[in-house]
Amino acid sequence: MRVLGIDTSNYTTSAAIADESGFRQNRKILSVGKGECGLRQSNALFLHTVNLPEIMRALSPMEKIDAVAYSAYTREVEGSYMPCVIAGKAVAESTAAVLGVPVYRFSHQAGHLMAAVKTCGNEEIGKGEFLAFHASGGTTEMLHAAPDETIGFTADIVGRTLDISVGQLVDRVGVMLGLTFPCGGELEKMAMRSTLKKPPMKLSLKEGNCNLSGAENAAQKMLARGDDPCDIARFAILFAAKNILAMSEAARETYPDLPIVYAGGVMRNAIIKDILAKSLPNVWFADTELSSDNAVGTAYLGLERHKREVEK
């Protein structure tokens, strides 16, 4: 049984094929102009439309496809939507129609969770309740998650950012320092050259929710007074890490026995992962390659759903 998955996010055009033996994927990061912190939805939609034929062609030969799955919305809540998913929808629905196979719709967030569940190294995660932290360019959420036969996972927010996301903090500071968006990888390299021990500002956590925009302002002040850019980079990453840790600790107070799995592009960062792994027990991370936007999780969601449908 083989499923084609498609995900068209704010940052990446992705397609993948998953079956019981593993997966193949191809993806392309959307081009962003120098000094810019992301794309307009209309521009992202255009780039997905340009990228998808190339992305799909690179997966050939696909052999027999039994079902198609795609990211149809951001989160599993009413009104959750972003225009750039239209490109993925068009290709997925058309492909399924031509092949005469079922098409399954999931949330972009569920795809992230499934990619993490499949690659974190703990086969028990995803079989019952667990905590999941989704940290990306558009999301900073601590979730109480559980498997669901139809939508992949239920995910209730138990902590979130009240302003910008950790990914936005990282990218805005990176662009401030002259890096090209998305900035996570290059900012991490700069931070590795710094000896800064802790972020020079206090966290602002309330009922498990965080505020991050103050760190962007602090980084601007550090730059204005001539601080080492590497120290500014490390400050931003440490501040993000400390907030993720504090939100994780708050969730653990309510759910002390549940594992935490971390997903999303920000979780590619080795500094952040090291802090979390050394500070908390029973924490798990998506494979580095599948932390950022991908269609692998979406393909696996479709595979699991299709197996259940066939068995009915």
Predicted regions and their residues:
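Conserved phosphate-binding catalytic cores of ATP/NTP-utilizing and phosphoryl-transfer enzymes
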Residues: 1, 101-131, 301-304
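Short, well-ordered amphipathic alpha-helical segments that serve as non-catalytic structural scaffolds
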Residues: 29, 47-61, 243-247
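A short helix-loop
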Residues: 8-9, 24-26, 124-128, 133-136, ...
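Short glycine-rich, Thr/Ser-proximal phosphate-binding strand/loop in the N-terminal lobe
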Residues: 9-46, 151-157, 285
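Glycine-rich phosphate-binding/hydrolytic loop that grips phosphoryl groups
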Residues: 112-116, 286-312
